[in-house]
């Protein structure tokens, strides 16, 4: 009996080590492909039509697009409304869809809600594990926000998105 439990324990440890190796190995850059164009102000961005399983959670007023912040690294953006910009940054492990219920309660005729999805999550590019750092995420989000030519924003950050988002401003 104890021998069998020992084998089971050893097997679980080995599986855990294999899993840890698989999760932390380098990985490779995966760049998503969009289609079409989305006009934001006087700029044009690569459109990202939402798949049906995601589109059912938002209204047709939402704009879904990519901003390429470095070669091959794209940040997926969701945006809705017109008026004063509100920048909402989700944390781990979620995406811009986190804020959809909050957005439902906002006066979208007076606010423009901008919701990037962190690199590595959702529809944004996937990068090797070694590239996930506060400094890199700050830089990528800063580049995305700079493309939108925002003079000022109201900022909302949650979890990991708090430090990353505030660093991007």
What do the PLM-derived regions correspond to, one by one?
Residues 2-84, 108-111:
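Alpha/beta-hydrolase fold catalytic core
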Residues 6, 10-13, 89, 115, ...:
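Hydrophobic alpha-helical transmembrane segments of multipass integral membrane proteins
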Residues 57-58, 70-71, 115-157:
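Active-site loop/oxyanion-hole signature of alpha/beta-hydrolase fold enzymes
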Residues 73, 78-123:
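Conserved HGGG/HGGXW glycine-rich cap/lid loop of the alpha/beta-hydrolase fold
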Residues 101, 167-168:
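Active-site signature of alpha/beta-hydrolase-fold catalytic machinery across serine-
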Residues 106, 168-169:
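Aromatic pocket-lining residues of Rossmann-like dinucleotide-binding sites
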Residues 157, 161, 165:
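Gly/Ala-rich beta-loop-alpha elbow adjacent to hydrolase catalytic centers
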């Amino acid at each position: 009996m104890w021998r069998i439990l020992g084998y089971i324990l050893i097997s679980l440890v080995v599986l855990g080590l294999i899993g840890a190796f698989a999760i932390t190995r380098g990985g490779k850059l995966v760049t998503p492909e969009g289609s079409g164009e989305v006009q934001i102000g006087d700029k044009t961005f690569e459109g990202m039509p939402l798949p049906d399983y995601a589109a059912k959670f938002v209204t047709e007023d939402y704009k879904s697009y990519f901003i390429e912040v470095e070669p091959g690294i794209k940040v997926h953006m969701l945006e809705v409304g017109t008026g004063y910009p509100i920048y909402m940054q989700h944390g781990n492990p979620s995406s811009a869809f986190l804020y959809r219920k909050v957005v439902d309660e906002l006066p979208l005729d007076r606010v423009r809600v901008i919701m990037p999805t962190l690199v590595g999550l959702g529809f944004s590019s996937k990068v090797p594990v070694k590239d996930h750092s506060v400094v890199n995420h700050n830089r990528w989000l800063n580049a995305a926000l700079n493309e939108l030519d925002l003079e000022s924003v109201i900022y909302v950050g949650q979890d990991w998105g708090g430090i990353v988002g505030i660093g991007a401003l």
